[in-house]
């Protein structure tokens, strides 16, 4: 891969700035998942061990009004957690755009980049201010690599030296291999609510997968394209013709039985797809379909999963996603999962350590699989030519 990685550079006595993805979920003032921080730790610890003169890490958190400080979205909670994981002092720096005074043996966390006006617009002046803070910029935030922001793309343009962190490099390696050199059979699962949000993903995976399992609300449009009544289920009528075109790929697999109800909080009824009533809504795939898909998954050598196949948050619409998840982890396949809802389902079923690779990207994960250019990665590649 044409990206300089962290191990290619000598960091000793250098000022190093790491752009991590520390955008953790917060509820009632508490971090509810430390997964993104933990995923960033190997890069941070590697830099600390390399003898850098100063080590800085920054990230965005949430969506504050740009240019305004919001204590609820401050990185101070992240600092508190990092201090538990790192033996040297960890300091939060709020005012850093005009330079930083620092002492050795400290990790400096630069406050939420979205508090800086111009961050999401990739303001050139702001990008140059970031770049002036460091000798080496390490891009390690795969989750934001699809955004051309000042702290991901702009700084990479102006920093003296740039490279990919361990997390970003690993994400690119794993996903590239799965897409370009998969061990076959390759099975993909695409769930979620709307076809419109995953049209490019479906199009790409239908071409490279041996089997493409479609579930969730997305499946409703495909079922309607086959002539089935989906009642009051979530449906995108304007995409039925597109679904018909995709169904020409004979590797797309749809449920033949489903769990329905008139509302999410009502009891579920298991029905063949031909039996869905006019007032019913589909909220999960049925057991027959789930078990049929499970057998295919257990024969796979590569599995790519994005999106639950039902409303797994509710007990009566959980079974389909649970059966597929268990089939994935009991297979001998190299399994990759990405997307917030997918990772939430995996976490709910306590299968985090049984999936081969959990991608930290949501939008970036989808964009990469779809074949889109990730601006921050493209800039790293461009700079690599000149490093």
Curated annotation (Swiss-Prot):
It is found in: Cytoplasm. It holds the Pfam family PGK. GO terms for biological process: gluconeogenesis; glycolytic process. Pathway: Carbohydrate degradation; glycolysis; pyruvate from D-glyceraldehyde 3-phosphate: step 2/5. GO terms for molecular function: ADP binding; ATP binding; phosphoglycerate kinase activity. Its main location: cytoplasm. Substrate binds at residues 21-23, 36, 60-63, 114, 147. Its EC number is 2.7.2.3. GO terms for cellular component: cytosol. It comes from the Bacteria. ATP binds at residues 198, 313, 339-342. It catalyses: (2R)-3-phosphoglycerate + ATP = (2R)-3-phospho-glyceroyl phosphate + ADP. The keyword Cell inner membrane does not apply. InterPro entries: Phosphoglycerate_kinase, Phosphoglycerate_kinase_CS, Phosphoglycerate_kinase_N, Phosphoglycerate_kinase_sf. Keywords: ATP-binding, Cytoplasm, Glycolysis, Kinase, Nucleotide-binding, Transferase. Belongs to the phosphoglycerate kinase family. PANTHER family: PHOSPHOGLYCERATE KINASE, PHOSPHOGLYCERATE KINASE 1, CHLOROPLASTIC-RELATED. Monomer. This is Phosphoglycerate kinase. It comes from Baumannia cicadellinicola subsp. Homalodisca coagulata.
């Amino acid at each position: 891969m044409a990206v300089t990685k962290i191990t290619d550079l000598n960091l000793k006595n250098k000022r190093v700035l790491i752009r991590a993805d520390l955008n953790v979920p917060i509820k009632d003032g508490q971090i509810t998942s430390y997964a993104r921080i933990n995923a960033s730790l190997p890069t941070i610890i590697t830099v600390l061990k390399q003898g850098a003169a100063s080590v800085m890490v920054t990230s965005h958190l949430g969506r504050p009004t740009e240019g305004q400080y919001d204590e609820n979205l401050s990185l101070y909670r992240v600092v508190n957690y990092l201090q538990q994981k790192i033996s040297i002092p960890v300091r939060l720096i709020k005012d850093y755009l005009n330079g930083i005074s620092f002492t050795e043996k400290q990790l400096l966390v630069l406050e939420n980049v979205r508090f800086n006006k111009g961050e999401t617009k990739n303001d050139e002046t702001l990008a140059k201010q970031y770049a002036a803070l460091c000798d080496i910029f390490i891009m390690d935030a795969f989750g934001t690599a699809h955004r051309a922001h000042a702290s991901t793309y702009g700084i990479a343009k102006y920093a003296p030296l740039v490279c990919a962190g361990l997390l970003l490099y690993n994400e690119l390696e794993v996903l590239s291999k799965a897409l370009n050199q998969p061990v076959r059979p390759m099975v993909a699962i695409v769930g979620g609510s709307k076809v419109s949000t995953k049209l490019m993903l479906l199009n790409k995976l239908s071409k490279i997968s041996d089997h493409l399992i479609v579930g969730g609300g997305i499946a409703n449009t495909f079922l309607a394209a086959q002539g089935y009544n989906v009642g009051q289920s979530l449906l995108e009528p304007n995409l039925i013709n597109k679904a018909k075109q995709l169904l020409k790929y004979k590797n797309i697999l749809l449920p033949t039985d489903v769990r329905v109800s008139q509302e999410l909080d009502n009891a579920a009824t298991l029905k063949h797809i031909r039996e869905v009533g006019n007032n019913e809504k589909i909220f999960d795939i049925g057991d027959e379909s789930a078990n049929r898909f499970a057998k295919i998954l257990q024969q796979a050598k590569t599995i790519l999963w994005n999106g639950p196949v039902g409303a797994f948050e509710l007990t009566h619409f959980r079974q389909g996603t649970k059966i597929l998840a268990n089939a994935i982890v009991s297979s001998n396949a190299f399994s990759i999962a990405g997307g917030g809802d997918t990772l939430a389902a995996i976490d709910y079923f306590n299968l985090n350590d049984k999936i081969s690779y959990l991608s930290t990207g949501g939008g970036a994960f989808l964009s990469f699989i779809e074949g889109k250019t990730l601006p921050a990665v493209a800039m790293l590649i461009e700079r690599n030519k000149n490093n």
